Amino acid sequence: MNLLMALFIDASLSLILISIAFWLPQLNIYTEKAGPYECGFDPLSSARLPFSMKFFLVAITFLLFDLEIALLLPLPWAIQIPKLSAMMVTSFILISVLALGLMYEWMNKGLEWTE
């Protein structure tokens, strides 16, 4: 019985707080707060602004290298596994792929902002 009463009180209190949080901000709407914020850009202008392809390529390269670094993060805990040589070979291959990708991007001037 106490459990049912506690669940009922918790559910009703949660429902009251959620409804207050939903309805209270709608009482006084500020025009500046109601407008969208687009990272400092005017949201009323054209949405088809030219996009820098260099920025896109550098961003994709960053995401790929960041993913490979995320794969390397658990390696210190992998030292505790019995097959230490397999872990070392895997980490060496992963670091080699990372270094080769960085060299390829550097040689093809994929990391340059100016052309």
UniProtKB/Swiss-Prot annotation:
Q: Which Pfam families match?
A: Oxidored_q4
Q: Which GO terms describe its molecular function?
A: NADH dehydrogenase (ubiquinone) activity
Major localization listed first in the record, in broad terms: mitochondrion
Q: Where in the cell is it found?
A: Mitochondrion inner membrane
Q: What is its EC number?
A: 7.1.1.2
Which processes are annotated in GO (biological process)? Answer: mitochondrial electron transport, NADH to ubiquinone
CC per GO annotation: mitochondrial inner membrane; NADH dehydrogenase complex
- TM segment ranges: 3-23, 55-75, 84-104
Q: How does this chain sit within the bilayer?
A: Multi-pass membrane protein
Oligomeric and partner information: Core subunit of respiratory chain NADH dehydrogenase (Complex I) which is composed of 45 different subunits. Interacts with TMEM186. Interacts with TMEM242.
Functional summary from the UniProt entry: Core subunit of the mitochondrial membrane respiratory chain NADH dehydrogenase (Complex I) which catalyzes electron transfer from NADH through the respiratory chain, using ubiquinone as an electron acceptor. Essential for the catalytic activity of complex I.
Q: Which family does it belong to?
A: Belongs to the complex I subunit 3 family.
Name under which the protein is recorded: NADH-ubiquinone oxidoreductase chain 3
Q: Which organism is it from?
A: Sigmodon ochrognathus
